[in-house]
From Swiss-Prot:
Residues 21-285 form the Protein kinase domain. One of its GO terms (biological process) is G2/M transition of mitotic cell cycle. SMART domains: S_TKc. It is an enzyme of class 2 (transferase). SUPFAM superfamilies: Protein kinase-like (PK-like) (SSF56112). Residues 388-404, 481-494 have a biased composition (Low complexity). This is Probable serine/threonine-protein kinase KCC4. Present with 538 molecules/cell in log phase SD medium. CDD domains: Kcc4p_like_C.
């Protein structure tokens, strides 16, 4: 193509528009350039623009003096792509070029590549896979019938439109196949290339395309490739392809028909390979074939169309050659003599002239068929205001395009610049050898086409009927209209001949050149204008289809959005119900017939009085004193407002009762030990709440509230509740001075008691409550003063702790174990004597304050407890202020350490303690001098490995009850974890470690270590584990 000088514009910034197309976002990159989304400025139609750099042409051996001239093979390739008009072949709409790039305006496939569909969804169902495969075979059959082979078929080059129809794209490797010549270029992808291409042998392109289709079918049905190497070794892959070595899927993966078709396609010998038309008649494709598919197959051109382009529908050879198509071939071959082309068309065998003739002839038939179908039921009316322009010129003007130079070029270019570039309409040409019997080729959009009357080649003079070439060549209104579609805008070239159009190409003042965009070449542009005309009707049809697609897409999105909203609403409701159920299950109190909120205490009292339910002793009451429960707040019913005065009074009494129960719960046995002469207290039986009458208090003898006495508190487990219950009671210690003077207080209470040194071991061992209370009080003082005066503390004076119990089912009653026991006494300075509160109001059978949580004493006998008699040291500093004692719980020691501690105490005491062996199934506790790590031990009679596995499963099942961060060290048999403070047991957060150690003779030992946190929490955990082991019968008796 001849290009005018545009150096002043070549360095400019690349334009965002090419002709009428406005370039947009980049869709992807290829080997020859990038692909951008484009939109028509007037119609809004979207296309894909493939940008090809001209530097590729120069690198491929194009050494023309004019760089803007495209190679002939590129021009032919573009014409072939345009002439391939099939629903399953990607359409080429237009071609534009600049100084540096070539722009191919292609059909836009919205759903992308078939490869991405397989990656996202995996193998397709057989019906969908066969529908896609059938469209691929039909499109390739169309190309093969016209002598075109693709040679690069793969899922990446198969695109999908908005309706998931196949569009075969990327004809960059395509070639014209003839019988005389075999192809030799090795091209394509290794996974899809045929064995003959991989081997480097001359091959027939039709058979190689069939092999690629077989690989694609395998991928559609299985989601993988038949020839592949996991390590990426291309050499091994090519060897597999050469041998045709692959694994056929079994019947469970694909059907027998699919196995048969794949076996017939993937044959190494191309001569034995199934033909493309035979695939369409295979039972697998016939299984899912529809009427529409049958029609598409029927509309395919003859299989040997490229061999006999001059044959008619009955394969009878026709000697006549269409002159208009012949002239187009002359234009395409850049002035090649027509006789030479005619001889090529009539000779035997195949050649490129026959293939191009067949393509143009097929294109012409499709255009005529489409035009006749649109105008079948229309009545043509004569329009007086419409004109018909015909151009007459001699064939000499066609053959010598630059022979007419009668007027200055400047004037001619200006006139045609206004007529062409300003309207941005492209010209249409149809070359005809006979002005009377030649007919225009109507394009698919039925745009108006002006045909040129070409006279005899021997006539050199201009006919008298031809006007001045620089004036408009229009006839009168009475001239007969030759366009097929009425009411279409005129878009024809108003020059006298092709010679004048060629001269305009060389003009520098063209507006196309000013906008840095031009057509490819003069002769090539002539052909492109004829077959690429973007007709108005075609664009309107596309706009209508696009609008319908958008409306359907909007409806589909609306339905999907509504469905998603409904699903989200349903999931939210379901999640809310599950969360509510979890909350209800987590609440330990029964929820039967609770009509109102559980937050307010008045509602609880009214419900208890109304229903009179026998509550289980294993449940915890719900009240405002319990911080772990926060139910939903609701308003009180109207009938309860009348009882406000009575309920307020009752509320105070209930609260005082609860406080007194916590204040006095652990002092019952202490009081019994201090008064050995009094009668035994009968055990309190489990009974429902039967009354809320005011309790009788002795104001002179008992403090009414805990806040009345400023004392430190030490929380421990009450003996009046079952071990399954988590209630705690508070033992009041009257200042740290009372710790020293407790023995003197006991002596004053009963002066006949013997001194501490004479206390018999049996009496001391039967009632551990007093010793435990004193020990706990002593521990509080020691823990607080440990950091300050640790050097002054004598560890020998600290009493040894006693076991807290053997299990949750073993309980202490409130009887005096021995009425004649001797209390501990100690000489000290006299201090103020404070009377402990009496329990007269709770000794009755129907007492309402504590009866709810009591149960009958367990029949399991308690093990005898070992105690050591030692004096309480007085060397603790008195500088600590009153009320600052903390609840730090001492660490524990093993049995051997306890004996060593007792031996050390023997040096300072008169009477050596008598040690009684503890039961092996009890939890052992000891206290270090300054340590803060608690150790508990449980003995079992099974091997340590079996015991560790049982603990592993047990603790895993307790994760939902507050056990977190469990770490299992199988090698060392160590389990570490944490009990969080928001657990269902409402215990303090504690970090613990459990070790399973061998104990000889197939026995084992569980050792609990408290790292940080609460001793009470660790003891609770050890006790619960001990109960489970006792039920399983694995405790060491």
């Amino acid at each position: 193509m001849t290009v005018a000088n545009t150096e002043t514009h070549s360095a400019a910034k690349p334009s965002s528009t090419i002709g009428p197309w406005k370039l947009g976002e980049t869709l992807g990159f290829g080997s020859t350039g990038k692909v951008q989304l484009a939109q028509h400025e007037r119609t809004g139609h979207r296309t894909a623009v493939k940008v090809i750099s001209k530097s590729i042409f120069n690198n491929n051996g194009n050494h023309s003096n004019d760089d803007s001239v495209l190679p002939y093979n590129i021009e032919r390739e573009i014409v072939i792509m345009k002439l391939l008009s099939h629903p399953n072949v990607l359409s080429l709409y237009d071609v534009w070029e600049t100084n540096n790039n070539l722009y191919l305006i292609l059909e836009y496939a919205e759903k992308g590549e078939l490869f991405n569909l397989l990656v996202d969804h995996g193998p397709l169902p057989e019906r969908e896979a066969i529908n896609c495969f059938r469209q691929i075979i039909i499109g390739i059959s169309y190309c093969h019938a016209l002598g075109i082979v693709h040679r690069d078929l793969k899922p990446e080059n198969l695109l999908l439109d908005s309706f998931y129809n196949i569009k075969i794209a990327d004809f960059g490797m395509a070639a014209l196949q003839t019988d005389a010549d075999l192809l030799e270029t090795s091209c394509g992808s290794p996974h899809y290339a045929a064995p003959e291409i991989v081997s480097g042998l001359p091959y027939e392109g039709f058979a190689s395309d069939v092999w690629s289709c077989g690989v694609i079918l395998f991928a559609l049905l299985t989601g993988r490739l038949p020839f592949d190497e996991e390590n990426g070794n291309v050499r091994d892959l090519l060897l597999k392809v050469q041998k045709g070595q692959f694994e056929m899927p079994n019947d469970t993966e694909i059907s027998r028909d699919a196995q048969d078709l794949i076996g017939k396609i993937l044959v190494v010998d191309p001569r034995q390979r199934i033909k493309i038309r035979d695939i369409l008649s295979h039972p697998l494709l016939k299984k899912y074939q529809t009427i529409k598919d049958s029609k598409s197959i029927k509309d395919l051109p003859r299989e040997n169309t490229y061999l006999y382009p001059l044959a008619d529908s009955n394969n009878h050879t026709s000697a006549s050659i269409d002159d208009s198509i012949l002239q187009n071939l002359v234009v395409l071959w850049h002035g090649r003599h027509a006789d030479d082309i005619v001889s090529k068309l009539k000779e035997n065998g195949t050649n490129k002239e026959k293939i191009l003739y067949a393509l143009l002839y097929r294109f012409k038939l499709d255009s005529v068929r489409g035009s006749n179908k649109k105008n079948r039921n229309k009545i043509k009316k004569t329009k007086k205001n419409k004109r018909s322009s015909t151009l007459s010129s001699s064939s000499s003007l066609l053959l010598n395009n630059r022979s007419i130079q009668s007027t200055p070029r400047r004037r001619t270019s200006k006139r045609h610049s206004r007529e062409f570039s300003s309207s941005r309409k492209r010209s249409s040409f149809l070359l005809s050898s006979n002005p009377t019997d030649s007919s225009p080729i109507p394009l698919r959009s039925s745009k108006r086409i002006t045909h040129i009357n070409v006279a005899s080649a021997n006539t050199q003079a201009t006919p008298s009927g031809v006007p001045n070439p620089h004036k408009r060549n229009s006839k009168k209104r009475s001239s007969k209209r030759l366009s097929y579609m009425p009411n279409t805008k005129r878009s024809s070239l108003t020059s006298k001949s092709l010679s004048n159009f060629t001269n305009l190409i060389d003009d520098d003042d063209w507006e196309y050149i000013e906008k840095d965009a031009k057509r490819t070449s003069s002769n090539f542009a002539t052909l492109i204008d004829e077959i690429f005309e973007p007709e108005k009707f075609e664009l309107a049809k596309r706009e209508k289809a696009e609008l319908q697609r958008k409306v359907q897409e909007a409806k589909r999105q609306s339905v999907n959005a509504q469905k998603i909203n409904e699903d989200e609403f349903g999931s939210e409701v379901s999640d809310g119900m599950k969360e509510l159920k979890k909350i209800n299950d987590k609440v330990s109190s029964p929820l039967i017939n609770y009509e109102f909120s559980q937050q307010e205490l008045l509602q609880d009292i009214d419900t208890l009085l109304t229903n009179r339910y026998q509550l289980s002793s294993y449940t915890r009451p719900i009240s405002r004193l319990d911080p772990g429960l926060t139910p939903v707040t609701e308003t009180l019913p109207n009938n309860l407002k009348e009882k406000t005065a009575l309920l307020q009074d009752t509320e105070k009494k209930i609260i005082e009762t609860i406080r007194r129960s916590k204040f006095l719960g652990s002092l019952l046995n202490v009081r019994g030990g201090l008064s050995p002469g009094k009668s035994e207290l009968a055990p309190i039986e489990e009974s429902p709440i039967v009354s809320t009458t005011p309790l009788i208090y002795n104001d002179r003898m008992e403090p009414r509230r805990i806040s009345d006495v400023e004392v430190p508190h030490f929380t421990r487990k009450s003996k009046h509740f079952t071990t399954a219950n988590n209630r705690r009671s508070v033992l009041s210690l009257y200042a740290k001075d009372s710790i020293k003077d407790l023995n003197e207080f006991l002596i004053k209470e009963d002066p006949d008691l013997p001194p501490q040194g004479s206390t018999d071991n049996e009496s001391r061992s039967e009632d551990p409550e007093i010793a435990e209370s004193i020990t706990d009080s002593r521990n509080i003082q020691y823990d607080e003063d440990d950091s300050k005066d640790g050097d002054n503390v004598n560890n020998d004076n600290i009493l040894s702790d006693f076991p807290q119990g053997v299990g949750i089912s073993q309980e202490y009653d409130m009887k005096d174990k021995n009425p004649n026991q001797s209390p501990i006494s100690k000489s000290a300075e006299p201090t103020l004597v404070v009377k402990l509160p009496s329990l007269s109001s709770f000794q009755g059978k129907n007492a309402s304050g504590l009866g709810l949580y009591q149960r009958e004493p367990s029949k399991v006998t308690l093990p005898s407890l070992t105690s050591n008699n030692s004096s309480v040291g007085e060397n603790i500093e008195d500088g600590a202020e009153k009320g600052t004692e903390s609840e730090k719980i001492a660490a524990s020691l093993s049995d051997d350490d306890l004996k060593e501690d007792n031996d050390k105490k023997d040096n300072d005491t008169v009477n050596a303690p008598t040690t009684v062996k503890k039961p092996p199934n009890s939890v052992l506790l000891k206290k270090f001098s300054k340590g803060k790590i608690l150790e508990l031990e449980i003995h079992a009679k099974i091997p340590e490995k079996r015991l560790y596995e049982g603990l592993h499963k047990l603790l895993e099942g307790w994760k939902q009850y507050g056990l977190k961060n469990l770490v299992f060290n199988i090698t060392n048999m160590i389990i570490t974890g944490k009990l969080v403070n928001d657990s269902i047991l409402f215990l303090r957060s504690t970090l613990f470690e459990i070790m399973v150690l061998p104990n000889g003779d197939g026995r084992s030992l569980i050792k609990f270590n408290k790292k940080t946190g609460s001793t009470k929490t660790l003891t609770k955990l050890a006790t619960e584990i001990q109960i489970i082991l006792q039920k399983e019968g694995v405790l060491d008796k």
